[in-house]
From Swiss-Prot:
1-deoxy-D-xylulose 5-phosphate binds at D8, H9, R44, H49, T99. The gene is pdxJ. This is Pyridoxine 5'-phosphate synthase. Pathway: Cofactor biosynthesis; pyridoxine 5'-phosphate biosynthesis; pyridoxine 5'-phosphate from D-erythrose 4-phosphate: step 5/5. The active site is at H42, E69, H190.
Amino acid sequence: MRLAVNVDHIATLRNARNASLPDPVTAAVIAELNGASGIVCHLREDRRHIKDRDLERLREAVTTRLDLEMAMTTEMQHIAIRTKPELITLVPEKREELTTEGGFDIIRHYDTLCRYIKPVQDAGIEVSIFIEPEEEAIERAASAGAEIVELHTGPYSLKKTPAELETELMRIRKAATFARSRGLRVVAGHGLDYFNIVPFRTIEEIEEVSIGHALIARAALVGMETAVRDMLRIIN
């Protein structure tokens, strides 16, 4: 299983003091040097953490795989085509939310999505869609032409009892299996940490996990190098 590191909250910490440090690009390079297979950043419409210049510098620096999380807007489409990350992940976005709160409503926005992703793919960029682990959403992602789905693991991360965790894990496992049967590659992310990630090692269909907050929080205490290596030891 591969690890993609989200560096958004390095930028959050930097922006708290309107400073130049810590630098998300430096964090990304350290993550790559210590085994991360990809770097994730979310250029939100309000630019609350990652800024346009961060994205430009990340594109210059990242040597593995750059995943640009973004809303399905014309502005972001143009930015993606100009910047050319290896991958974009379409996510829902609300200005009042602290973090992404749920999967992309692919059923509601299906027709727009089909038109939206073609110019991106024509530019040589793969498309992933952040969705709930539900068969109908997966089916729509496949028929729209996406290459990848990222399964929303937020509800799983909030479960408390073993029974609740197992129920949600089975839901994710079933969704991952179905997605692979439809020819999609599968990523998982949101709310995963150094403890609740462990059962995901048994879901062979999930090729990568995307982790941000938990890893950056640990990096604040032990350093980015150690935080990345610790996570890689757990997932592999």
